[in-house]
């Protein structure tokens, strides 16, 4: 049984400190941006959904349909997003979350949180090749978090009398390419990654 329209939403995020080093097991602090959202609507279509393997949205829908064991699904997605793409604000993770929620809503299927995380991370593998999991975790959280890859995360009580200015330079970022650049540096990158990890720990101590 399906609905006429399936709807899913998700919010964006911003990394305060620890960008890229988090891929290598160092901590990062990330903040959810609750008011910057994306909405996905799943509606009926005349032809079956087609998979485009380089597209995060397509992979998120495919992973959802595969999990639900639905083949030749005649659906299409409509995305309405206030999250700028390629700006480090978790656009791909948020779109994946919204799309997965919309597909499950359309088919009126239960979506446990752990299943949502698994499906989002599958889609993120396509977008970023070797994601830390930080984007997905923050876009699924309503609180700031300190995150360590393959270890876990802790929520932070952040009550600071301060402002964080998020400015758009107009320059696109490419997470996959940035990760590849760091990888190409090999051992030469390790001192910088370690230093960034220490700065993140100092920032967490200051916040606490």
Map each language-model feature to its residues:
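C-terminal nucleotide
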Residues: 2-17, 21-23, 30-34, 39-71, ...
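DPxDG-like acidic metal-binding loop motif
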Residues: 89-112
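Short pre-catalytic strand/loop immediately N-terminal to key active-site residues, enriched for Gly-Thr
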Residues: 75-87
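Alpha-helical scaffolds flanking conserved acidic
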Residues: 114-116
């Amino acid at each position: 049984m399906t609905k006429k329209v399936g709807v899913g939403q998700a919010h964006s995020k911003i990394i305060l400190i620890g960008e890229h080093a988090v891929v290598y097991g160092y901590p990062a602090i990330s903040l959810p941006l609750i008011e910057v959202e994306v909405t996905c609507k799943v509606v009926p279509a005349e032809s079956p959904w087609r998979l485009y393997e380089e597209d995060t949205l397509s992979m998120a829908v495919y992973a959802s349909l595969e999990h639900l064991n639905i083949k030749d699904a005649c659906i299409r997605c409509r995305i309405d997003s206030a999250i700028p793409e390629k700006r480090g604000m978790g656009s791909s993770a948020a779109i994946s979350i919204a799309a997965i929620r919309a597909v499950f809503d359309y088919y009126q299927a239960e979506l446990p949180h752990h299943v949502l995380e698994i499906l989002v991370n599958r889609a993120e593998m396509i977008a970023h090749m070797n994601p830390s999991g930080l984007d997905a975790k923050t876009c699924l959280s309503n609180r700031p978090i300190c995150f360590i890859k393959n270890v876990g995360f802790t929520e932070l009580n952040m009550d600071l009398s301060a402002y964080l200015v998020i400015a758009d330079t107009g320059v696109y970022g490419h997470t996959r390419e940035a990760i590849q650049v760091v990888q190409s540096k090999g051992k030469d990158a390790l001192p910088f990654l370690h230093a960034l990890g220490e700065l993140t720990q100092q920032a967490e101590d200051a916040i606490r």
